[in-house]
Amino acid sequence: NFKSRINKTTALSDKNHRFVPFFGSSEWLRFDALHPAVLAEKYDRNYRPYFIGQRGAASLNQYLGMQQMLPELKNGTAVYVLSPQWFTKKGYNSAAFQQFYNNDQLSSFLSQNQTDANSQYAAQRILEMKPEITMKSQLSKVANGQDLNSLDKTYIQFMAELNKREDALFSPFAASNNANYDKKVLPYLKELPDKFSYEALDQVAVRDAEAHTKSNDFGIDDRFYKKRLAKKIGKLKGFQKNL
């Protein structure tokens, strides 16, 4: 579950399995032979990817989600994939941000008691995305570079404990996608060479791309192109020229 603290911290602190967080967006939902989960399984790597990302989740959501698991991330390994659609003139969509936001992320962020430039900018962006937000007074202080007083810190600590308990209560009810392993990982294992080599994987990638991009000259997957673009491709000419 993208918003759950306990799911993420439990996985990343597992002593019996080494999970490496892979931060991103909808990329992780698109499986093929070169998906990180498939590669890790095929070549029995000493870790397994722990995918943290959903369609529409962008950098601010990921930043806040990281606040929930800073001890687990410290001195560790992580992979972060940037999506081109994040970089727009108007910035992130407020509705999309709120879909992946919860109060535990905010109390985790404020509990760090940071007033540096990064925290200040993050606080400003959060207020832009959700103007009427819990702990707005404390968040506004961080956004303005002001120190939090003892009363602020006590309130934040209280809210942090409350949010942690709420997360622990509801997280077990989050839907599990473990059943997708047989459906989304195993079928692709046979497409990979038994012996790992970048040259061989390049050949797999080229062969797969050629087989699935025959309907257009843009290198776009045939199913996506036919369903989403084919009928309106003419209208898109010059669409992003002035961005």
What is each stretch, according to the model?
Residues 24-25, 80-85, 223-227:
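Short loop/turn segments at strand-loop or loop-helix junctions that form parts
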Residues 2-7, 57-66, 239-241:
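N-terminal post-signal-peptidase region of extra-cytosolic proteins
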Residues 4-8, 31-38, 212-224:
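Short low-complexity stretches enriched in small and charged residues
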Residues 28-118:
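Membrane-embedded segments
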